[in-house]
């Protein structure tokens, strides 16, 4: 019998998790990925013994990846953090003493209040890794109530460029609609059968393919889907904006765009048409490495196959040209009539939930947008979090003002932020650093206080997809956490009581879940029984109310470009880096299906599948440098070097090196930060040049060279 009842005050503790009981719980995956997969989890005596996919799952329909099967291993790992720790030696030396939760909370609050008194509230920042539930919004609330405008998260290289550019261009974030049939799906830098930041839509895509939908894959690597595609476009890493502009050139020049939609619902089409004339397939073939006839074939397929969905991936947001890449692709969706159409790219509608602005208490910090660190660097409005490059400048140089303290939850920033050496320098300069984690990481090892977090299956949770997808998922508790491991939501709630006025917080952190759900008319128990909430499906909304832009139309020509100091039309202003004969190869990276960013290298079941950091190199290139499969190799850029293991494969272009990201070694010594430098991709990246709109660094398309390690 399935149990969907959450462990709440109505049904908690021993009543819910009695010994000598076996129970199945319907829940959703979390913290191994974004968490879209519905799961059936079996627990015995407060221990998870079986996990499988739920065939009734809205997104995954029974499919789950290896990470889901291994997710319970985190809960019982012998190296898990189980008590608050305080540093008793030099920062990063790996010497700790156990402290109580009350002492840890008091120490953090005392130090942050002292920094606030000496430097102002904005000199304390609050940081989040990849958001997975309401804990990010609780953290934003904590910052606002405390008086700091600064929350740091990886939005500048993940989601925000697509979301914010969409809002400015067409009034919403256009996501691929896999719930309705498409004639064609374009996977642009999106490897949904292996890794997928959008939530698990792999099964929905495979279902469409089985029903005859064709696909185009735009990717530097020959992915599994590239081998099945109608067309695989193997572009040079970091040249997405050039290829998208060439598509626009073909479609407009040949007159195969949606003339009725363009005439009535776009602003600036004549200007765009004139602007893209120079971006011919012949001219764009050189920077993209794509033959002109392939460019034409791809453009024609997309324009003449309606509806077409463009599923775009994270790589688009990882160069200094992300604004132009994303703008060009939204223009492409618009001129081909695929915006707000079933089976095209659509706007999700949220279910009835507590308004975000009210929950995070934006009213307490009305000047926030002007006071955030990146506002002083001229980024485009609507960025909710601070780009990491600008954060570190504040920590190291005091620009635009000093940052002296930080609280981080669920982020291994030392590995995640570009140009890792600067992250180490920045954290070493802090007066105080506190970290919430489930396992000691290189970042946690630098902290003054480390707090042991509960992880998924150990607390009631809401998976929030909000802006992008319009649904929220129930993640009811399955087992009790170790006694001193707290959910991040509880940690933030208790920190809020210590740092600010208690009446601004909740008596119990689970009241936050009830508050979020209240507008829906459901309690958390009722929500868990339903499994998920989805906003209503509405298409072609522009027919009655236009688009939510200043002109009421899709702004191919951005009407507020001068105000935001950005280009009004998408441009090609070169590659991420200019070619350099000293670094003749092009470096890129991709995520592993076995890990989530830098997480879970310590989960043995996953590590067995990928024990070493792998760099893909083409056979011709390997032969030139006398490299064999399995060799240790050194990859170098202008910024630094790292060592990984060579994997010789024709899945990459001879001019491309594809390296693994997020690697550190939990088996190494904590006093040396777990060999964080050895194979760390971000030892090779730079923040010297940043994208104007979002402060995005170049993580792809970087000049490099390789050699065999001695």
Feature-to-residue mapping (PLM):
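N-terminal export/assembly segments and adjacent metallocofactor-ligating motifs
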Residues: 2-254, 283, 291, 409, ...
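Flexible glycine/proline-enriched surface loops and loop-helix/loop-strand junctions
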Residues: 90-92, 188-190, 228-229, 279-282, ...
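A glycine-rich phosphate-binding loop feature that marks nucleotide/adenosyl-phosphate handling sites
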Residues: 129-130, 264-267, 302, 345-356, ...
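Extended redox/cofactor-interaction regions of prokaryotic respiratory oxidoreductases
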Residues: 137-207, 211-218, 241-245, 331-445, ...
């Amino acid at each position: 019998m399935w149990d969907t009842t959450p462990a709440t005050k109505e049904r908690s503790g021993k009543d819910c998790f009695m010994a000598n009981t076996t129970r199945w719980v319907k829940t959703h995956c979390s913290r191994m990925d974004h968490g879209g997969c519905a799961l059936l989890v079996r627990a015995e005596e407060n221990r998870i013994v079986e996990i499988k996919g739920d065939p009734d799952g809205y997104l995954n329909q029974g499919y789950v990846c290896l990470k889901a099967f291994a997710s319970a291993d985190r809960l019982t790992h012998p190296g898990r953090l189980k008590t608050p720790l305080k540093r008793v030696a030099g920062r990063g030396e790996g010497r700790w003493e156990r402290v109580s939760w009350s002492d840890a909370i008091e120490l953090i609050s005392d130090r942050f209040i002292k920094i606030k008194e000496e430097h102002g509230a904005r000199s304390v920042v609050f940081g989040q890794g990849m958001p997975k539930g309401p804990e990010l919004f609780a953290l934003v609330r904590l910052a606002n109530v405390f008086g700091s405008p600064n929350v740091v998260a990886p939005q500048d290289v993940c989601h925000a460029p697509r979301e914010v550019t969409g809002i400015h261009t067409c009034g919403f974030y256009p996501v691929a609609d896999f719930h309705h049939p498409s004639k064609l799906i374009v996977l642009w830098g999106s490897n949904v059968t292996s890794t997928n930041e959008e939530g698990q839509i792999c099964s929905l895509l495979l279902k469409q393919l089985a029903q005859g939908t064709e696909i185009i894959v735009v990717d530097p690597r020959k992915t599994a889907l590239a081998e099945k595609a109608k067309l695989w476009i193997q572009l040079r890493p970091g040249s997405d904006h050039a290829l998208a502009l060439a598509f626009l050139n073909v479609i407009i020049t040949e007159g195969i765009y949606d003339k009725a939609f363009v005439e009535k619902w776009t602003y600036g089409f004549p200007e765009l048409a004139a602007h893209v004339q120079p971006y011919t397939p012949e001219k764009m073939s050189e920077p993209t490495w794509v033959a002109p006839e392939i460019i034409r074939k791809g453009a024609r397929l997309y324009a003449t196959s309606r509806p077409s969905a463009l599923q775009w991936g994270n790589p688009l947001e990882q160069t200094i040209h992300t604004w132009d890449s994303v703008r060009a692709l939204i223009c492409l969706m618009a001129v081909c009539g695929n915006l707000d159409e079933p089976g095209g790219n659509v706007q999700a509608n949220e279910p009835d939930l507590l308004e975000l602005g009210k929950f995070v208490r934006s009213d307490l910090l009305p000047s926030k947008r002007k006071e955030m660190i990146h506002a002083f660097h001229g980024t485009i409005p609507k960025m909710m979090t601070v780009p990491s490059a600008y954060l570190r400048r504040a920590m190291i140089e005091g620009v635009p003002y000093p940052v002296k303290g930080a609280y981080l939850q669920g982020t291994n920033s030392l590995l995640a932020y570009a140009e890792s050496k600067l992250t180490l320098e920045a954290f070493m300069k802090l007066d105080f650093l506190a970290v919430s984690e489930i396992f000691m990481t290189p970042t946690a090892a630098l902290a003054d206080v480390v707090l042991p977090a509960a992880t998924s299956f150990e607390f009631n949770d809401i998976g929030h997809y909000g802006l992008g997808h319009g649904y929220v998922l129930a993640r009811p508790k399955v087992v009790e956490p170790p006694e001193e491991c707290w959910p991040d939501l509880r940690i933030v709630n208790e920190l809020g009581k210590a740092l600010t006025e208690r009446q601004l917080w909740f008596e119990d952190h689970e009241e936050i879940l009830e508050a979020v759900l209240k507008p829906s008319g459901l309690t958390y128990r009722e929500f868990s029984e339903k499994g998920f909430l989805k906003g209503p499906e509405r298409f072609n909304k522009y027919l009655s109310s236009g688009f939510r832009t200043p002109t009421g139309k899709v702004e191919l020509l951005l009407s507020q470009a001068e105000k935001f100091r950005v280009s009004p039309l998408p441009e090609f202003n070169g590659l991420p880096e200019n070619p350099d004969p000293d670094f003749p190869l092009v470096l890129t990276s991709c995520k592993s299906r076995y890990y989530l960013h830098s997480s879970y290298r310590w989960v043995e079941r996953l590590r067995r599948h990928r024990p070493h950091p792998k760099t893909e190199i083409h056979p011709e290139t390997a032969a030139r440098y006398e490299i064999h499969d399995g060799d240790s190799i050194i990859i170098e850029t202008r910024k630094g070097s790292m060592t990984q293991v060579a994997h010789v494969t024709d899945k990459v272009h001879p001019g491309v090196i594809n390296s693994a990201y997020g690697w550190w070694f939990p088996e190494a010594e904590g006093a040396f930060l777990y060999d964080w430098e050895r194979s760390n991709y971000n030892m090779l990246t730079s923040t010297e040049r940043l994208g104007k709109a979002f402060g995005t660094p170049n993580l792809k398309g970087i000049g490099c060279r390789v050699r065999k390690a001695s």
